[in-house]
Amino acid sequence: EQIEPAIAQVVDKTTLVSFHAGANDVLRPGYRPENVFPIYNDAVRKLSATGATLMLFTVLEQTGNTGKTADMWAERFGAFNKNVRAIAVEVGAIIVDANEKQFLSDRRLLAFDRLHLNSLGHDRVAQGVLEVLDMPFDPNWRLPLPAAKPTPWLVKKATSVAWFITFALPWIWRRIRGKSSGDGRSAKYPNPTSWPLS
């Protein structure tokens, strides 16, 4: 839905198109890379064919968790990233690799849902993007966060329970019903918006 409006904005190679998609599909129980990768690659080729400068993103493979589930996610996201890197080479896209800086797996950069970046995480990634684009950036983005203070056991457990009730249970319920978290949602900015806002 977003590709055609984006293509309509392309002037030439001075237009930067950033594209990040497919990572949520990796989380689904019925995930099939043989279905997801061709759709992702077709979208990338379509955007690249416009002549715009194209930027792609990988996702974290290691999040600091351990165990069989963490290993499964690492394997899935590793294969996903391999595809992203391969198509980036094919079309000559810029790539922002989330796995180049180990500190990006620091959980303090994540929102409460443990899936998306919080404001600090977004700022770090934004500075990394500016560096990749050879634009002015804050070099401190590369510095790991200070050592975290130990979290009391009870606080950890309470936080995990709150997360499970708020995010995990609704996710499981949606999967059972064959629903997606995106069903019924519309884009925050469905139409092209000038930036900076005046």
Where do the language-model regions lie?
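Oxyanion-hole/transition-state-stabilizing segment in secreted/luminal serine hydrolases
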Residues: 1-37, 61-62, 168
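Short, hinge-like loop/turn segments at secondary-structure boundaries
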Residues: 3-7, 62, 72-75, 113-115
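Active-site segments of SGNH/GDSL-like serine hydrolases
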Residues: 20-24, 45-78, 99-105
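Short glycine-enriched, charge-decorated loop/helix-capping segments at active-site entrances
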Residues: 31-34, 69-74, 111-112
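Charged helix-capping and loop-helix junction motifs
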Residues: 33-41, 76-81
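A structural motif corresponding to the C-terminal end of an alpha-helix
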Residues: 43-55, 83-96, 132
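Substrate-gating cap/lid alpha-helix
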Residues: 64-98, 119-123
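Conserved catalytic region of serine esterases and O-acyltransferases that act on ester linkages
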Residues: 90, 113-116, 120-198
